[in-house]
Amino acid sequence: MKFEAVVRTDLGKGASRRLRHANQFPAIVYGGEEVPVAIVLDHDSVINQMDKPAFYEVITLVIDGKEVQVKPQDIQRHPYKPKVNHMDFKRV
């Protein structure tokens, strides 16, 4: 399973809200020897794969052309809408 991601430059609550209104959501990739990286993911491409068991195993994120093997660590969902607010990924 592979997802395209972009490094996030604007941080904070306002920037996160703008992303969510644009049908995207913020995420972070951490772990290993590298520094944590804030990224942006497309909501529809992720939410359509979340019901599959393979999503919760090792997946590939393509962050600005570089492939990174990660595993979902934490998923923050909207209380009553079928939306993802934020995700944490841990490098494998």
Curated annotation (Swiss-Prot):
Gene3D superfamilies, per the entry: Ribosomal Protein L25, Chain P
NCBIfam families according to UniProt: PRK05943.1
General function of this protein: This is one of the proteins that binds to the 5S RNA in the ribosome where it forms part of the central protuberance.
Gene source species: Photobacterium damsela subsp. piscicida
Domain of life: Bacteria
Single GO MF annotation: 5S rRNA binding
Keywords: Ribonucleoprotein, Ribosomal protein, RNA-binding, rRNA-binding
Family: Belongs to the bacterial ribosomal protein bL25 family.
The organism's taxonomic lineage, starting at the top: Bacteria, Pseudomonadati, Pseudomonadota, Gammaproteobacteria, Vibrionales
One BP term from GO: translation
Protein name: Large ribosomal subunit protein bL25
Any one GO CC term of the record: cytosolic large ribosomal subunit
Any Pfam family matching the protein: Ribosomal_L25p
Subunit structure: Part of the 50S ribosomal subunit; part of the 5S rRNA/L5/L18/L25 subcomplex. Contacts the 5S rRNA. Binds to the 5S rRNA independently of L5 and L18.
InterPro entries reported for this sequence: Rbsml_bL25/Gln-tRNA_synth_N, Ribosomal_bL25/Gln-tRNA_synth, Ribosomal_bL25_short, Ribosomal_L25_dom, Ribosomal_uL5_bac-type
